[in-house]
């Protein structure tokens, strides 16, 4: 399971001219689900995402996690993160989970975030989405479990 996380001052996702999720300060989490992923991996990735200390403390040091910074999380499904890009000029998506399994794990990940008392907004699974964000820093990390 893969999370591309970006520290943002604001982010939103729109589907068919409807804003489905919007946050201020926090993390935009682009989530990719791979074939071998399960709930245990989702738990571990959620723990890492929410615990990752990439917000500045009073001394300007990256030392706070999203909850300590008073932030929110916007989770957007992105199957392209599971692409194999090693060869050729066209990505292969054979490493991605089947759509039903990917959706179940995406929803599980979102629910785990919400259980941690963090405001968690979402896109819409498998929809054509427009994501807007202001990346603060820029600060972007690839987390994989």
From Swiss-Prot:
Location, primary (coarse class): cytoplasm
Subcellular location: Cytoplasm
Entry comment, domain topic: A Gly-cisPro motif from one monomer fits into the active site of the other monomer to allow specific chiral rejection of L-amino acids.
Catalysed reactions, as listed in the record: glycyl-tRNA(Ala) + H2O = tRNA(Ala) + glycine + H(+); a D-aminoacyl-tRNA + H2O = a tRNA + a D-alpha-amino acid + H(+)
Physiological role: An aminoacyl-tRNA editing enzyme that deacylates mischarged D-aminoacyl-tRNAs. Also deacylates mischarged glycyl-tRNA(Ala), protecting cells against glycine mischarging by AlaRS. Acts via tRNA-based rather than protein-based catalysis; rejects L-amino acids rather than detecting D-amino acids in the active site. By recycling D-aminoacyl-tRNA to D-amino acids and free tRNA molecules, this enzyme counteracts the toxicity associated with the formation of D-aminoacyl-tRNA entities in vivo and helps enforce protein L-homochirality.
E.C. number: 3.1.1.96
Gene: dtd
Pfam name, any one: Tyr_Deacylase
One GO-annotated biological process of the protein: D-amino acid catabolic process
Keyword field: Cytoplasm, Hydrolase, RNA-binding, tRNA-binding
UniProt similarity note: Belongs to the DTD family.
Entry keyword Cell inner membrane: no
GO cellular component: cytoplasm
Organism: Salmonella paratyphi C (strain RKS4594)
GO molecular function: D-tyrosyl-tRNA(Tyr) deacylase activity; Gly-tRNA(Ala) deacylase activity; Ser(Gly)-tRNA(Ala) hydrolase activity; tRNA binding
UniProt subunit comment: Homodimer.
Matches recorded under InterPro entries: Daa-tRNA_deacyls_DTD, DTD-like_sf
Entry superkingdom: Bacteria
UniProt protein name: D-aminoacyl-tRNA deacylase
Motif (Gly-cisPro motif, important for rejection of L-amino acids): 137-138
């Amino acid at each position: 399971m893969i999370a591309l996380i970006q520290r943002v001052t604001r982010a939103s996702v729109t589907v068919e001219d409807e804003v489905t999720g919007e946050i201020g300060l926090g993390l935009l989490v682009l989530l990719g689900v791979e074939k071998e992923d399960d709930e245990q991996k989702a738990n571990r990735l959620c723990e890492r995402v929410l615990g990752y200390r990439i917000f500045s403390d009073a001394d300007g040091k990256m030392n706070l996690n999203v909850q300590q910074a008073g932030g929110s999380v916007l989770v957007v499904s992105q199957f392209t993160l599971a692409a194999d890009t090693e060869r050729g000029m066209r990505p292969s998506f054979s490493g991605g989970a089947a759509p039903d399994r990917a959706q179940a794990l995406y929803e599980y990940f979102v629910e785990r975030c919400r259980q941690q008392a963090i405001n968690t907004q979402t896109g819409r699974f498998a929809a054509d989405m427009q994501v807007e964000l202001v990346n603060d820093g820029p600060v972007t990390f690839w987390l994989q479990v």
